[in-house]
Amino acid sequence: MLEQGLLVTAGVAFLISVALSPLFIPFLRKLKFGQSIRDEGPKSHQKKSGTPTMGGIVIYVSMMVTTLIMAIKFEHLGAEVSLLLLVTFGYGLIGFLDDYIKVVKKRNLGLTSKQKLLGQLIIAIAFFAIAKGQGFDTHLMIPGTDITFDLYWAYFILVLFMLIGGSNAVNLTDGLDGLLSGTAAIAFGAFSIIAVAQEQYAVAIFCMAVVGAVLGFLVFNANPAKVFMGDTGSLALGGAIAAVAILLKQELLLVIIGGVFVMETLSVIIQVISFKTTGKRVFKMSPLHHHYELCGWSEWRVVVTFWSVGFLLAVLGIYIGVWM
């Protein structure tokens, strides 16, 4: 019965997101909350300048309302839901401030890297402290095995790394119309299946609410995008998916299910290291999706390819997390 309720959860979040977006997009235009495009980015992206941003607010509202309604209905409103909403709201707020400074204060870089890192660190510490207070253990499980290691306080460092790194990795992926919306829906969908297998229904409800919310947003975010989620959405989704992996004790599996985010991040790291040490670039541009654009791929082809890779990695992650 609850499994059917999870589909209803996704459906409700989808409908809320689809209903809110047409109302919110004109509001963003009226406020002149338009995306500015970097000059050093692909030239084809210049036509996107002025597209409303901060649409991640729609994703958050749709997800939060649906999660609370369904968690209460199925009597799964507990510490897990509170922690997930805390992280999503906290990282979403950081993203909102970053977007606000960019579009309203006209400061292209938004928050400074130190300001952003400090905010991410505070949210991550709060998450760990609350989880530890709820009796959350510090074991790390090797996916597909019964092997676990107690990391003790080193687990605290792992949590910080996952939440901060995860939010930034997902943020890097949000560079093409619909790219992040699609890959996020796939990844959260995979974790919802693992959550059901573990009978962690509160986490499953949250994941399916996110799936519905981002798919509803994708209707307006697919190429050509009528709205961007901005850092408001991408940082929130990144923090949320890392928190989900931590609560499910599938920390290492996040590397597989979130493989697209990992590849995007590695491409940036490799590019920076290569340029600083040799003066040469490995990729035509990073993150990786821009490299393929400059190789002549259409934006839609890049997006669908990355969705496909994300789907295959999600299937692999489900196989390891559920059946191995």
Swiss-Prot record:
Task: Reply yes or no: does the keyword Phosphoprotein apply.
Answer: no
**Pathway recorded for this protein:** Cell wall biogenesis; peptidoglycan biosynthesis
**Cofactor(s) recorded in Swiss-Prot or TrEMBL:** Mg(2+)
Question: Record keywords: DNA damage included?
Answer: no
Q: Which GO terms describe its molecular function?
A: metal ion binding; phospho-N-acetylmuramoyl-pentapeptide-transferase activity; UDP-N-acetylmuramoyl-L-alanyl-D-glutamyl-meso-2,6-diaminopimelyl-D-alanyl-D-alanine:undecaprenyl-phosphate transferase activity
Identify the GO cellular component terms for this protein: plasma membrane
Checking InterPro entries in the record gives: Glycosyl_transferase_4 (IPR000715), PNAcMuramoyl-5peptid_Trfase (IPR003524), PNAcMuramoyl-5peptid_Trfase_CS (IPR018480)
Q: Which Pfam families match?
A: Glycos_transf_4, MraY_sig1
- EC number per UniProt: 2.7.8.13
Q: What is its main location?
A: membrane
Broadest EC class?
transferase
Keywords from UniProt, A to Z, are: Cell cycle, Cell division, Cell membrane, Cell shape, Cell wall biogenesis/degradation, Magnesium, Membrane, Metal-binding, Peptidoglycan synthesis, Transferase, Transmembrane, Transmembrane helix
Instruction: Tell me the NCBIfam families matching this sequence.
Output: mraY
What task does this protein carry out? Catalyzes the initial step of the lipid cycle reactions in the biosynthesis of the cell wall peptidoglycan: transfers peptidoglycan precursor phospho-MurNAc-pentapeptide from UDP-MurNAc-pentapeptide onto the lipid carrier undecaprenyl phosphate, yielding undecaprenyl-pyrophosphoryl-MurNAc-pentapeptide, known as lipid I.
Instruction: Tell me the protein's name.
Output: Phospho-N-acetylmuramoyl-pentapeptide-transferase
Please report the organism this UniProt entry assigns to the protein: Bacillus cytotoxicus (strain DSM 22905 / CIP 110041 / 391-98 / NVH 391-98)
Organism phylogeny: Bacteria, Bacillati, Bacillota, Bacilli, Bacillales
- Gene giving rise to this polypeptide: mraY
